[in-house]
Structures are given as structure tokens and as C-alpha cells.
Amino acid sequence: MAELLAVEGLTAGYGDSIALEGVSLALEDGDSLALLGRNGVGKTTLLVTLMGLTRVRAGTLRWRSTDFAAWPTHRRSQSGIGWVPQERHMFPSLTVEEHLTAVARPGPWTVGRVYEIFPRLAERRGNYGNQLSGGEQQMLAIGRALMVNPALLLLDEPMEGLAPIIVQELLSVIRDLVTGSGMAVIIVEQHAKLALSLTRQTIVLERGRVVHRCASEALLRDPDTLHRLVAVT
């Protein structure tokens, strides 16, 4: 498969503070990566850096072999990076359908297809963003990211704070996206075993540095190492 994303020696942060140091990773088309670590180690920072929202101090970022470190966020999105932020970023003045159509790019993902995987959004298509439950907002955030028809989907804590029945619904959708959509996926998820079960490879961050990388299946079979790497102490 062709190289999609390459990050080499990335050092980045906010203002004068450094949140990531010397981070490297690579993804091919259709690949999947779990990004694990304790709270505050730089997982979300890595995703927002990929979206152009932090200050890159060193290292290289390549998208399909092209350096994209200087690209603004909208160009990254237009080039095929979909982002589901932890905060969801709903607009109270836009309806469900307007959230979807506002970012739409040509491709297999359409409003109708989003409604197929999330029928609840079809029922709420005329509702405003602030009229949705937390689970519905997360469905909309994922649907909106899919509407850019991404080659890479970034998921930041997609299950956080949701009822178990909603988690199961989202898990089914995300599993199908990882295994059957052809797009690459990076998942930040506090439930480490869940993230490992969904992905092919894993990196673990500690204090902004990569301290472990392996096949997800191998770490899933090694609970002692997993606990040592991600358990809260």
C-alpha cells in the first residue's frame, strides 16, 4: 500500500511550551493506529498538530509524500483529513443537515449515506446542534468528518461520556469504518483494550514522547505490559 501519512521527529506545542518531542509514525492507505497513554501525555496534541492547530518546532509532516507542515487547517481537511475533536464543536445555529452539507466534498460519503449509518440523525435532521443529546452530537461529529470524504479519519475519545447503548452503536460503526471503508484511522481512546481491538498498530506516549510501539494484537495479548504503559499510578 502507498504511504499516506509520515511524521518524523515531530516536536510541537502551544506557544512556548513543548507538548510533543521527537514523535514519529507512519500510516498507509487503509491502515489503523491506536494512540494510547495516560491523561496529559500529548495524544490530543498530536491530533490537533496533524490538523495544523499547534506550533511545530521541529520534524517533518508528509501527506502522500508532500510536506504539509505549513498547510492551514482547511487545506488539510480539503486534502482528505477528517477530524472528530473531543469537544465535538457543534454550531447552535446550524441544523443537523446543515452541519453535514457545510463541509461536503465529492466522494462516496453523502448525507444519505451518513443517515444510513446513523438513522437517528435522519430523524433529527431539522434540529439544531444544541438540541441534540451527547450521543447524537457525537454521531453528527463523526458524520460531519465523513462528509469531507477523508483518506484519514482522526477520532479523539469518540466514546467519552456516552451511555453504554450509544457506545455499542458507535463501536459498531467505527469498527466498520476501520475494517471496510478503505480509509486510514487514528483513534485516541481512554478504553485501551477497545482501541487495541479496533486497530492494526499502536503507539504509546509518555510525556510527549513515544515510549512503545507494536502491533495492537500483541499488546492486547500482553495485559501486564498494557497496564504498565497506560494504567493511572
What are the roles of these predicted feature ranges?
Residues 36-38:
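The feature captures the beta-strand-to-loop junction immediately N-terminal to the Walker
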Residues 51:
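Helix-to-loop junction immediately C-terminal to a conserved catalytic motif
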Residues 145-146:
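ABC ATPase C-loop
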Residues 55, 67-88, 111, 123-127, ...:
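ABC ATPase NBD coupling module
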Residues 198, 204-209, 213, 220-233:
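C-terminal boundary and immediately downstream tail of ABC-type ATPase nucleotide-binding domains
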Residues 153-157:
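Catalytic Walker B motif of ABC-type/P-loop ATPase nucleotide-binding domains
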Residues 59-68, 79, 109, 113-116, ...:
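Conserved ABC transporter NBD signature motif
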Residues 168-181:
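Helical segment within the ABC ATPase nucleotide-binding domain
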